[in-house]
Amino acid sequence: IAYISSRVYAGYASGRLNPEPYAYEYGFGVRNQMLRQIAGDPTLNYDPAKGAARAPLLLWGPYLWADGTTPRKSDDLTWSRQDFKQDGVHPSKSGTEKSASLILDFFKSDPTAKPWFLIAG
C-alpha cells in the first residue's frame, strides 16, 4: 500500500518553486494516478491475480492542502504565513507540527492503516 497525499498550500511562496495553483492542482495529479489504477492500467497493477504486480495499491492519505487562512469546510484546517519558512514553501516548526498531526491522525483512524499502525510492539 502507498498512501498518497497532496502537498500543503503554497500561496506564500516567494519564488517560482511550486506556487499556487500548482500546489492545489497537484491533488488532481494524485487523483488521476489512482483513477488509472482503478481503470486497470497495467503499469499500475498491484494485484498478482491480474498480471505482473508493478505498483503498490494506491490509496488516499491525508489531504494536506487548504486555501491559506480560509478554513477548510470539512475540518477548519488553515495555513498561515507563520506555518512556513522564509521561502513560503517549506513548513516552519508550526507547519511541520500541523502536518505531522494530520498524518498521525490519519494513520490512527484510517481503516486500512489502523490495523497495522496501532499494533503494540
Feature annotation, model-predicted:
Residues 6-121:
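Catalytic His-Asp segment of secreted/periplasmic serine-dependent ester chemistry enzymes
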